[in-house]
Amino acid sequence: MKRVTRSIASASVAVVALIGLLAGCSSPKARFYTLDPDNTVERASTATPVRVVVGPVTIPDLVDRPQIVTRVSANEVKVNEFARWAEPLKSEISQVIAADLRTMLGSDQVTVVDTGSNAMPAWRVRVDILSLYTEPAVAVSMDALWTIQPPGKQPAIAGRSVVREAVAGDGFEAIISAHNRALASVSRDIATSLRTPSGR
């Protein structure tokens, strides 16, 4: 009986050791990231009395996925399984542009959804991201076409923003910060058109 007891005890120790080994070899947990309005954007000293609805926003199929896609070389990209967007990237971009415009225009009437409950006519902003390249520790490059549709039958206003923001450091936090600044540059171009006489 003593020999049997020792065998069982030895087997138990082996099982515990194996479980510990497997736990140590398990895949790392994914981390989730969100975009934010650029914290260097200052609120307009004079408000622009305008209601704006941001959307739709389109992005390239390459980056339209939960994983953050980074560029390895001219013809190679990396789909980062353990670095993911907390929300669909299109939704993140539209919300950040709307938040940037609220600050830049000094208007709280900038949304991503038109409820139709406001009597003030809305200006509609469509943004088509033609390319979005992320080079870790180097730069985020963005090429965006945007169209402002005024209320009524006024002609649309079209523009293009080509932006390159340096990634100041290693890691995904630095990458996200560069995305935020790139979107702020796009928002700044849109806000300028909304403020000009031809844009209002």
Predicted segments, located by residue:
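N-terminal segment of the mature soluble domain
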Residues: 49-119
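Bacterial N-terminal signal peptides that target proteins for export
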Residues: 2-13
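C-terminal motif of bacterial Sec signal peptides marking the signal peptidase cleavage site
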Residues: 21-24
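Surface-exposed short loop/turn segments
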Residues: 26-43, 47-48, 104-152, 167
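Short secondary-structure boundary motifs at beta->alpha junctions and helix caps
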Residues: 77-86, 152-188, 192, 199
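Generic beta-structure capping elements
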Residues: 55-57, 68-73, 145-147, 151, ...
